[in-house]
Amino acid sequence: MPRKGPVAKRDVLPDPMYNSKLVTRLINKMMVDGKKGKSQTILYNAFDIVRERSDKEPMEVFEQALKNIMPVLEVRARRVGGANYQVPVEVRPERRTTLGLRWLVNYARLRGEKTMEERLAYEILDAANNAGASVKKREDTHKMAEANKAFAHYRW
């Protein structure tokens, strides 16, 4: 742990095509072995597929999808008197976005389409329409928090 106080949060630069920090964060989440160029190409091609399929701007569709994926509540383990309780807590805005992007990429990777571009595009389209595995993950997270509402008084 640093002795000089909290470490400053590094800000990402907006991407060149859409001028969005959110897109840059998605590119960074998708990146494997430091190959950012490849990640960028995949994302931009996925956005082209989104544009073809939905007849809307890909950024609008992506932002709607992310809004549908981001969780509001989650559970965190809290040990009280020898027992572990799943305590529901509200998700901070920064973590909300991070989880949304992480789930989007992870569940896109698990899809059955042939290329990553197609997988990502269809996961974004599904999420924008409140369907898909990443939205289901958010629903499951919320259900878990709802089921453990009785332990809400243990939150810290």
From Swiss-Prot:
Sequence similarity: Belongs to the universal ribosomal protein uS7 family.
Gene3D superfamilies: Ribosomal protein S7 domain (1.10.455.10)
Biological role stated in the UniProt entry: One of the primary rRNA binding proteins, it binds directly to 16S rRNA where it nucleates assembly of the head domain of the 30S subunit. Is located at the subunit interface close to the decoding center, probably blocks exit of the E-site tRNA.
Cellular component terms per the entry's GO annotation: small ribosomal subunit
InterPro entries from the UniProt entry: Ribosomal_uS7, Ribosomal_uS7_bac/org-type, Ribosomal_uS7_CS, Ribosomal_uS7_dom, Ribosomal_uS7_dom_sf
GO biological process: translation
Protein name according to UniProt: Small ribosomal subunit protein uS7
UniProt keyword annotations, A-Z: Ribonucleoprotein, Ribosomal protein, RNA-binding, rRNA-binding, tRNA-binding
Top-level taxon: Bacteria
UniProt cross-references to Pfam families, sorted A to Z: Ribosomal_S7 (PF00177)
Biological source species: Bacillus cereus (strain G9842)
Subunit details: Part of the 30S ribosomal subunit. Contacts proteins S9 and S11.
Gene Ontology molecular function: rRNA binding; structural constituent of ribosome; tRNA binding
SUPFAM superfamilies, per database record: Ribosomal protein S7
